[in-house]
Amino acid sequence: MCPAFSIFFNSRRYSLTPPTYTPSPKPPTPKPTPPTYTPSPKPPASKPPTPKPTPPTYTPSPKPPTPKPTPPTYTPSPKPPATKPPTPKPTPPTYTPSPKPPTPKPTPPTYTPSPKPPATKPPTPKPTPPTYTPSPKPPTPKPTPPTYTPSPKPPTPKPTPPTYTPSPKPPTHPTPKPTPPTYTPSPKPPTPKPTPPTYTPSPKPPTPKPTPPTYTPSPKPPATKPPTPKPTPPTYTPTPKPPATKPPTYTPTPPVSHTPSPPPPYY
């Protein structure tokens, strides 16, 4: 094989690996040291403290109490009640078509709150819970623990160790430990819980429900309106979907190999 061709072949073969990029090391730029700021010493005592002027005491001039103007008593002009003829109002009751007797409708007005008088019965079962007060629960078991005081615990075994004292110490003065004061807490009187006031709701008088006015609609002439035929909904025929075409297969373009130009052959 010709040496020039072998060099060209080798350069083509080894050109597939990209050259490693080694950046030139930059010298570390030294950070400039900030100049130390030395403030000029101010003479502290040269400036006498200027006394603040006392603000003048503002004494507001007493305003005379402005008398509130009494609002004029509104006396409505008496309307003559006789000018309003109440005759046209009784005419709607006359507009009760007799041919349609609404006999089942008057029965609901008969359902008046008259059977509600049992509500006037005082709520006797409610006062019974207030009678269950915590007063019969005497806190007697609590005073019993205070009776368990340290007094029955005689500190006699503790004075015995002071008897085991060196001979220079006179055993005649064994410092007996002071008996701890028997802490007998003052028995708190059982604070009876305040009995909640028996809430006796004021019996509300059974408010009679106003009888609803018997609404007698005007008799509509039956069968005068021909039944409108409901339009038949249009049958929904879905449009046939075209057969799903396969997406075009993506053929990636081959990457352009950026191969450097071969070095000139060595002769």
Swiss-Prot record:
<keyword id="KW-0379">Hydroxylation</keyword>
<dbReference type="GO" id="GO:0071555">
    <property type="term" value="P:cell wall organization"/>
</dbReference>
<feature type="repeat">
    <location>
        <begin position="108"/>
        <end position="128"/>
    </location>
</feature>
<dbReference type="GO" id="GO:0005576">
    <property type="term" value="C:extracellular region"/>
</dbReference>
<feature type="region of interest" description="Extensin repetitive element">
    <location>
        <begin position="261"/>
        <end position="265"/>
    </location>
</feature>
<feature type="repeat">
    <location>
        <begin position="180"/>
        <end position="195"/>
    </location>
</feature>
<feature type="compositionally biased region" description="Pro residues">
    <location>
        <begin position="20"/>
        <end position="267"/>
    </location>
</feature>
<feature type="repeat">
    <location>
        <begin position="55"/>
        <end position="70"/>
    </location>
</feature>
<keyword id="KW-0961">Cell wall biogenesis/degradation</keyword>
<feature type="repeat">
    <location>
        <begin position="233"/>
        <end position="253"/>
    </location>
</feature>
<keyword id="KW-0134">Cell wall</keyword>
<keyword id="KW-0325">Glycoprotein</keyword>
<feature type="repeat">
    <location>
        <begin position="71"/>
        <end position="91"/>
    </location>
</feature>
<feature type="region of interest" description="Disordered">
    <location>
        <begin position="1"/>
        <end position="267"/>
    </location>
</feature>
<feature type="region of interest" description="Highly repetitive">
    <location>
        <begin position="18"/>
        <end position="253"/>
    </location>
</feature>
<keyword id="KW-0732">Signal</keyword>
<feature type="repeat">
    <location>
        <begin position="212"/>
        <end position="232"/>
    </location>
</feature>
<feature type="repeat">
    <location>
        <begin position="92"/>
        <end position="107"/>
    </location>
</feature>
<keyword id="KW-0964">Secreted</keyword>
<protein>
    <recommendedName>
        <fullName>Extensin</fullName>
    </recommendedName>
</protein>
<feature type="repeat">
    <location>
        <begin position="34"/>
        <end position="54"/>
    </location>
</feature>
<feature type="repeat">
    <location>
        <begin position="18"/>
        <end position="33"/>
    </location>
</feature>
<feature type="repeat">
    <location>
        <begin position="196"/>
        <end position="211"/>
    </location>
</feature>
<dbReference type="GO" id="GO:0009530">
    <property type="term" value="C:primary cell wall"/>
</dbReference>
<comment type="function">
    <text>Structural component in primary cell wall.</text>
</comment>
<keyword id="KW-0677">Repeat</keyword>
<feature type="repeat">
    <location>
        <begin position="161"/>
        <end position="179"/>
    </location>
</feature>
<feature type="repeat">
    <location>
        <begin position="145"/>
        <end position="160"/>
    </location>
</feature>
<feature type="repeat">
    <location>
        <begin position="129"/>
        <end position="144"/>
    </location>
</feature>
